[in-house]
């Protein structure tokens, strides 16, 4: 099968996707997880394996531990209003369990059943959901879940946000010996500024009646 080309989504596509993801015939944790990727610029695997113990709703931060980060470095992810709203919504489904965007067949079918654990979504969950339900999303050109992360980064650079800061927000591996030591100062406030910019851009895109 031919792979979908890497790309960033335009504003019309973002509007359509955000408003149509809920039409997909999948568990809500998948649609919420996809939106969460765009809000936080995080990787699909990071979202799928996010645990409630890593989320600080009051502090508005998600701490991805080093053993889960692709580059092996702890990553503090600031949470904007969109991300917090998604977490409050998914909490109704998985609150009290292990994984934020996890799945437990018994609990999802019978909410009265008491369960303490759920399972993280399969590696292919996001990709499969979008591939099978693409016709429901309302855009012409196919895209991958990772394109949501890429789109967030593109939106930031398009309004003049520094590529260096975008790289830190994406938790890319620093180049050079000196750069590899920068994590003693996490640049959290700079990353929060970027996440707030994403909120502002999404507000502008999603507040219109139609595009």
Regions found by a protein language model. Give the residues of each.
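Hydrophobic, well-ordered secondary-structure elements that form the walls
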Residues: 79, 130, 153-156, 166, ...
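Active-site/catalytic core of tyrosine-dependent DNA strand-transfer enzymes
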Residues: 8-15, 59, 80-140, 173
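Basic, Lys/Arg- and aromatic-enriched nucleic-acid-binding interface segment
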Residues: 1-50, 58, 69-73, 93-94, ...
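Catalytic-site neighborhood detector that most strongly recognizes the C-terminal catalytic loop/helix
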Residues: 8, 66-72, 84, 106-108, ...
């Amino acid at each position: 099968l031919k792979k979908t080309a890497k790309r960033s989504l335009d504003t019309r596509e973002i509007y359509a996707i955000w408003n149509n993801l809920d039409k997909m015939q999948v568990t809500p944790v998948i649609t919420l997880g996809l939106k969460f990727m765009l809000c936080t610029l995080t990787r699909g695997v990071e979202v799928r394996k996010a645990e409630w113990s890593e989320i600080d709703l009051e502090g508005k931060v998600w701490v991805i531990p080093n053993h889960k980060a692709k580059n092996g470095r702890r990553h503090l992810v600031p949470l904007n209003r969109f991300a917090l709203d998604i977490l409050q919504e998914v909490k109704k489904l998985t609150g009290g369990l292990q994984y934020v965007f996890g799945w437990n067949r018994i609990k999802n079918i019978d909410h009265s059943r008491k369960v303490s654990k759920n399972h993280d979504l399969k590696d292919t969950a996001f990709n499969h959901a979008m591939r099978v339900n693409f016709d429901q999303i309302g855009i012409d050109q196919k895209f991958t879940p990772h394109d949501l992360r890429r789109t967030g980064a593109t939106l930031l650079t398009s309004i003049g946000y520094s590529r260096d800061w975008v790289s830190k927000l994406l938790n890319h591996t620093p180049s050079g010996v000196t750069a590899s030591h920068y994590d003693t100062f996490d640049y959290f406030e700079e990353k929060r500024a970027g996440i707030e910019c994403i909120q502002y851009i999404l507000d502008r895109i999603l507040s219109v009646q139609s595009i």
